């Protein structure tokens, strides 16, 4: 995974981090392993059913400095929480699936691309004020169209 390498390069002191769209938990466990001891990682998944899977996987990982949450980005906007690092692995329009799944081509539309673009902007806008001054925002998506 690439994001844990980024964390190891940039983060050398304990931090408070938010993995905003974390299910099923692979990124969060890799991130937590890469963070300095004393760091606290919030692993969040807005979709309830996916957050339950996330919670199970985080529990199996067994690191005590991880908190699983089930919030939408706008909920964090309302909070007073401030994070040193935020990872936003935002929803995408799915072009990367074309080579693996014939059905993905049939489901693709310009409207879906536009919807994803608006949702991505909304997510970043909602969590921006939760990033401490000088903090790190890691923006990730699998398709840029």
Could you tell me what each predicted segment is?
Residues 1-145:
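S-adenosylmethionine
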